[in-house]
Design a protein with these regions (language model features):
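N-terminal binding-site loop/beta-alpha segment at the start of enzyme catalytic domains
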Residues: 1-79, 140
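Structural preference for beta-strand elements that scaffold enzyme active sites
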Residues: 5, 12-16, 51-52, 79-83, ...
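Acidic (Asp/Glu)-rich catalytic clusters
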Residues: 7-11, 47, 69-79, 99-108, ...
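Active-site mouth loops of central-metabolism enzymes
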Residues: 21-36, 83-93, 123-124, 215-225
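Short, acidic/polar
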Residues: 31-45, 91-106, 152-161, 227-234
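Acidic-and-aromatic substrate-binding clefts and catalytic sites of carbohydrate-active enzymes
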Residues: 56-65, 87-94, 121-124, 155, ...
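Active-site groove signature of glycoside hydrolases
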Residues: 102-123
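Beta/alpha (TIM)-barrel catalytic core signal, keyed to glycine-rich beta->alpha loops juxtaposed to Asp/Glu
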Residues: 118-291, 295-304, 308-311, 318-333, ...
């Protein structure tokens, strides 16, 4: 296993296990975790050098933390690192949630603690509730070793957070699709500019880059692994990446990802060009080809942040396509429930002003209506 230096001589495995997609007893939304299989995956990861395990208060209906803690309980506490997250939407009582997490994990401290999924729209909730100063105090007391946040917002919001508070690390969505077609490259460069270690989530874009359409497969560089392996290699090759998380749900994924992380092979310029071409083909296939120009926002009587809403919709459609199950992908829209009601898709009046001003001619009210129905 390849390792990356963090702070204070800490060495983190380049591959981390994301405990959001643990094996289930049967396919489907909110089905029970297959605990024996989950433990088998974790044991295999530990045996092959993976030492970073990421969970959250809401994963697997609150069961992820307990299962992870039990699986790791047989190993020396200094042989692994656990990352956990405070979710203000799940329970704004941050003191209760933090203690509940320690109890679920069966641990006296959490190595890497994050504010969960900050966006431009939810940043104020985290900043105003008092949780930041509380968690900084927990760090002083040793109950948190490193404090950061996971992020799904704009580069401007990321820069503001970095310049306002002190963080030990930040976790962003980074993959070659978002690098070439989204804002991942900008976010990465901002973090490098501020000398903040980067933890990576969604290296295969919710599964989209692991299940490429045929015309994209033809462009994939020959040899050296599957589409998922190429996606992981792209991210692991970047300087300053501390950990690349993968939500692995079966042993085949675990074994392949460990082999990829062990290889440490750098991508050539020609290979990077091929991945860029694949990302462009995927962009043209994406459900809603919104470019984020915001002409729609300037003319929306409800003041909706339409590009952000459509971005959530695209995440939902991407995951649904990757999983082959729309119901299992609806969670991608759940972050919109954190918005004030007048900013949610249901607030759309259907006036059509957005479509009239959209250079792409998108039927935005139809997407708003679909999201509203899915969120009910």
């Amino acid at each position: 296993m390849k390792y990356a230096g963090f702070k204070e001589n800490i060495k983190l495995s380049k591959l981390g296990l994301g405990a959001m997609r643990l094996p289930q007893t049967e396919p489907g939304l909110a089905k029970p975790v297959d605990e024996p299989k989950a433990r088998e995956l974790i044991d295999y990861c530990m045996a092959h050098g993976v030492n970073y395990y990421d969970t959250a208060y809401i994963y697997h209906g609150g069961k992820s933390e307990t299962i992870l803690g039990q699986a790791l309980s047989g190993y020396p506490r200094d042989s692994y690192y656990v990352a956990d997250k405070f979710n203000v939407q799940a329970n704004p009582d941050y003191q209760f949630q933090f203690q509940d997490q320690l109890d679920r994990l069966g641990m006296e401290y959490i190595d890497f603690y994050l504010l969960h999924g900050i966006t431009d729209l939810t940043a104020a909730d985290y900043e105003s509730c008092g949780c930041i100063s509380y968690f900084q105090e927990q760090k002083k007391q040793g109950k948190i070793r490193h404090f950061g946040f996971s992020f799904h917002g704009t580069p401007d919001c990321l820069r503001r957070l970095l310049e306002t508070y002190s963080w030990d690390f930040v976790q962003i969505q980074l993959n070659y699709y978002d690098w070439y077609q989204g804002t991942a490259k900008q976010q990465y460069e901002i973090l490098r500019e501020h000398d903040v270690p980067v933890m990576v989530m969604e290296p295969v874009h919710g599964g989209m880059l692991a299940s490429l359409p045929e015309d994209c497969m033809e462009l994939l560089p020959k040899g050296n692994g599957s589409p998922a392996a190429w996606a992981l290699r792209f991210v692991m090759d970047l300087p300053g990446i501390a950990v690349v998380l993968s939500g692995m749900s079966d042993m085949e994924q675990v074994k392949e990802n460990i082999i990829t992380a062990d290889s440490g092979q750098s991508l050539t310029g020609a290979e990077l060009s091929q991945l860029a071409r694949i990302s462009e083909k995927l962009r043209k296939k994406i459900a809603v080809p919104c470019t984020g120009c915001r002409y729609c926002c300037d003319n929306c009587p409800q003041g909706l942040d339409i590009p952000s809403l459509l971005s959530a919709y695209n995440d939902y459609r991407d995951e649904a396509a990757a999983l082959g199950d729309k119901n299992m992908a609806v969670w991608r829209l759940h972050r919109l429930k954190a918005l004030e009601k007048e900013k949610q898709p249901a607030a759309c009046m259907g006036c059509g002003s957005c479509t009239a001003h959209c250079p792409q001619g998108l039927d935005i009210p139809a997407y708003m209506q679909e999201m509203s129905a899915l969120l009910q």
